[in-house]
Amino acid sequence: MVESALEPNITTKSVGQAIRAHLRVLKLTKKPSREEFLTIAKVAGAGILAVGAVGFIIYVLLTMLPQWVAK
């Protein structure tokens, strides 16, 4: 009885519906142009750098601030 409670309720009908939904989305997609890809890459890179810069600033503040306060 415990084993049946742990097994997910997956049927062939639900799997088929999920596959059809994924295929429908894939049919609507297209390969991005080179310009579109480069734009997306630049934006993603800028976001990564921004998050890294914020993290570095927080790190520097948390390591230097106690030294400044202790003086």
UniProtKB/Swiss-Prot annotation:
Gene Ontology molecular function, alphabetical: protein transmembrane transporter activity
Keyword Membrane belongs to the record: yes
Cellular component, GO, one term: plasma membrane
Topology term for the membrane: Single-pass membrane protein
Subunit structure: Component of the Sec protein translocase complex. Heterotrimer consisting of SecY (alpha), SecG (beta) and SecE (gamma) subunits. The heterotrimers can form oligomers, although 1 heterotrimer is thought to be able to translocate proteins. Interacts with the ribosome. May interact with SecDF, and other proteins may be involved.
Domain of life: Archaea
Intracellular or extracellular location(s): Cell membrane
Similarity remark: Belongs to the SecE/SEC61-gamma family.
Keywords: Cell membrane, Membrane, Protein transport, Translocation, Transmembrane, Transmembrane helix, Transport
Ranges that cross the membrane: 43-63
Function: Essential subunit of the Sec protein translocation channel SecYEG. Clamps together the 2 halves of SecY. May contact the channel plug during translocation.
GO terms, biological process: intracellular protein transmembrane transport; protein secretion; protein targeting
Name listed for the protein in its UniProt record: Protein translocase subunit SecE
Keyword S-adenosyl-L-methionine: no
Name of one Pfam family that matches: SecE
